[in-house]
Amino acid sequence: MRRIAVIGSGIAGLMTAHDLLKHGYDVTLYSDRSPEDWLNKSRPTGIAARFESSLAYERELGLAHWDKDFPPIEGVYLIFSMQPTIPFIILAGRLSENGAAIDVRLQSYRWMNDLVERGGKLRIENIDIPRLDTISAENDLTIVAAGKAEIANLFERNEARSVYTKPQRKLAMVVVKNTGKFEKIPYNPVKFNFIGDHGEAFWIPYYHKSVGMTWNLLFEAKADGKMDKFTNAKSGDEVLVIAKNVIKELFPWDYDWFKNAELADENGWLTGALTPIVRNPVGKLPSGRIVTGVGDTLTTLDPIAGQGANNVYRMAKNLVQNIVKHGNGTFDAAWMSNTFEEYYEKSGKATIDFTNLLLEPITDAGRQLLIAQYGSNGVSCSGQQVIANAFSDNFADPTFLTSYFTDSAKVRAFISEKTGRHWLPHTAGSLLSVVRDQVRQKIGMTPGAGYW
């Protein structure tokens, strides 16, 4: 039986370890914290939103312990504003299949215990480079799934694929209970607020480790904009107060929903920034031995597109499939590189491109797509609704529509196909509706599109 070590007990490490165990490998998982530490002492690692392909992978491995409990993510409700307090474009899109966001602290606690019960080995210790070298000597393959920890620097930055050299947003996240409900929206959405020069904010239905149904709020502030107020926050209470003020100032349509919100738990918050990066998949140790990586260790994404967890699932599944296919072969540098390239071509590039597109000013093609769907309501069968649903489904599978966002010809053909009309008169009619709703707001009325 081939021995494989996995370093890290987040989603990437645990999904990889469980899949390997299912395929009969001798698996040892190394974690810097115990299951109880994950559950009771840790911060959330992010929004942890995942879509149907990821949830199906959990079911395949017998890890879907919360399928009947979590609040479903049924679609996207997006408000795009050029300036604070004034909606410009509204999109109400439904997902083809529901997604979910589940507290990683609860998952890691349960999945680590599951691993031991199923015959895997668990070691609780901090792993540095010398210790990693020793572990590598004891195993046929060692996989680093340590997220953005210092050990990830063992893997060199891929300059050609890493677009950014510094963080693109200042981030703040808080998990809250005691919110209102979006009763007028006829489905349970991820609610997006995009606002010109200031940043983006997302409200995600979230299954919390002890409270159950909560909301996970993510703020993506552009430096020096009106959302950029979280940097000096020292506690979840401070983040919550700032969040209420930001929502009241920038997104007043959501203030009544949020004004009575409370922290779900004292550790349920984060602030910081990260630099998106793609790393090479071969890490060379001082002894000359090599290890590979999975998840954020190799591809760190800004959370703006909600692709972090989904990217991890795709990469882990591809990695295990290639391990199994490799049989008794040597896990050399060529195998590691080829395995990563297969993931990158199948889904990684599209996922990274989609995420980076949302960090940049909207493209002409993207603008045409948003205008063409204007009037979507989440329930109709109109051409606008079909386009809005397609936009939403790209979060579930970025290979679906990402290439269209930089190709106006493809977008125009897509609009014509989905609406049954030539793209030009359809888009012109939608643009007229946008202008009409701007006039309505100037005279004190709400937009005709959307739910208010």
Please state what every model-predicted region is.
Residues 274-352:
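Conserved mid-domain beta->alpha element of the FAD-binding
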Residues 33-81:
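N-terminal FAD cofactor-binding segment of flavoenzymes
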Residues 195-271:
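Conserved FAD/dinucleotide-binding core of flavoprotein oxidoreductases
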Residues 305, 321-452:
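C-terminal helical "tail/cap" subdomain of flavin- and related membrane-associated enzymes
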Residues 1-12:
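Beta1/beta-strand and adjacent pyrophosphate-binding region of the FAD-binding site
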Residues 7-9, 21-42:
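Glycine-rich FAD pyrophosphate-binding loop
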Residues 156-191:
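Central beta-strand plus flanking loop segment that forms part of the substrate or channel wall
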Residues 59-60, 67-156:
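Conserved N-terminal helical subregion
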